[in-house]
Every structure is written in C-alpha cells, then in structure tokens.
Amino acid sequence: MANLSDEDLLFLSNLMHIKEEGQFKNIWNKKNVDNKSSIGEMLENIDTDKLKDSDITYDGEISGSEWAAMIEKVKDNPQICNLKLVDMDIDDKKALSVCLHNDETGETYVVFRGTSAGEWPDNFEGGYKADTEQQRRALAFVERQNFDNITVVGHSKGGNKAKYTAILSDKVDRCVSFDGQGFSAAFYEKYGPLIEQNKSKINCYALDNDFVNILMSDVYENKTY
C-alpha cells in the first residue's frame, strides 16, 4: 500500500481551509460526502487563473497566488486526486474533520482542521485537562470509520487532535502534525503507558518562529523544524 508523503499531507491539511470565500465554493459539504466525491472532482471547477489575480488573503493566511500554485500541484498528483470524501463531521463550533479513502490502494486519511472560532475555550482547557470535548470528538470520529491503518493529520489544533487520536486509537498507525500544540500534565499522568507505546507513530513539523507548537509538552517520535 503506497502512502502519501508528509509534503502531500500538508497539502491535504491546507485544503481544509477551503470554504465559501472569494473565488472558492465550499467543497466540504454533505453532497460531496453522499456522492463520495474525489479530491480531483471537488477541485475540478476551481479557476486557478482567477485565483492568481485575486487580491484577498484567504482563510489560513493563504494568498490567491499561493492557493493557485498549491491547487495546480494537487491536480497533478493522482494519488491525492483519487482520494474520496467518505465521511465528514462539523459541529456547532465549526470544527471540521474529514475522512478520505482510496478504494484501489486502501489508503485512509483523517484530516482535522485547525482551531475554529468556537474552539478557543477548548484550547485553554487542554492546558489543564487530560481530555477535552474536542479531543474526545476527534477520537470518536476516527473510531467510527470502518477502516484500519489510518493516517491522521492536522495543523495547529488539528495537529493536537491528530496526536491525541494516534495515542488512543488502535485504528491509527501514522500521524503527521504541523505546528500542533502539546498536552497537559494531566494527559501525561493519565496516559503515560499509552504515550510510550504509541508515540513512535507521530512525526511533527514546526516552524522556528511558531508559538503554538511549543505550548505544553509535546508527544512525538521525530520533530523537524
């Protein structure tokens, strides 16, 4: 089974920022789940020339020209384009989780979006609680998938959710976190043996000047700056 590279997973994480905005229509919707639409199909009608000329900064602090370059690269990657949207969860806090699956290769990816507007209180709770509501919801989303050998990925709070599920779910065999915050002392006290058992699944990437990934104590096998 071929797996997406960590660079490809960063593209998936960035695609989570697409919503009804500027040149974009929201691709993360029930219709695309019901149709099991592929990434390629969902990106097909995005006009990258218009994106290049767009003068607004999109969600995730991504410019139109940056989006255009990224989407063109994704469209040229059949391994990403063939992934189908098979499940999605968006709650009252606008937290988004998606499950993507390739029928031919058996690859499965769960991607968590970064902090939504309604999740800031949950971020603060993560500083002193072993488990937060949003972490438990992320774990429940992974556990309801009818697949094993799942790769989980996310940026910022999404990265924290990915690491949390990698520690606690046997369905997860790989985790890639981009600038994800760490965990509380209560988390380490409650899950010490599971952390030691499962941290080998986790690769972390962090910018030198990013403050989120240094919050609290992190969990990983490898960390790249």
Predicted regions and their residues:
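A broad, low-specificity signal marking well-ordered, structured residues that form hydrophobic/aromatic
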Residues: 10, 98, 108, 202-203
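Detector for Asparagine
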Residues: 3, 14, 26-35, 45, ...
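Serine hydrolase/lipase
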Residues: 104-107, 146-149, 167-225
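N-terminal low-complexity, Ser/Thr- and acidic-residue-enriched intrinsically disordered segments
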Residues: 1-56, 60
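Gly/Ala-rich beta-loop-alpha elbow adjacent to hydrolase catalytic centers
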Residues: 154-158, 162
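A conserved cap/lid and substrate-binding interface adjacent to the catalytic center
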Residues: 47-151, 168, 172-176, 183-185
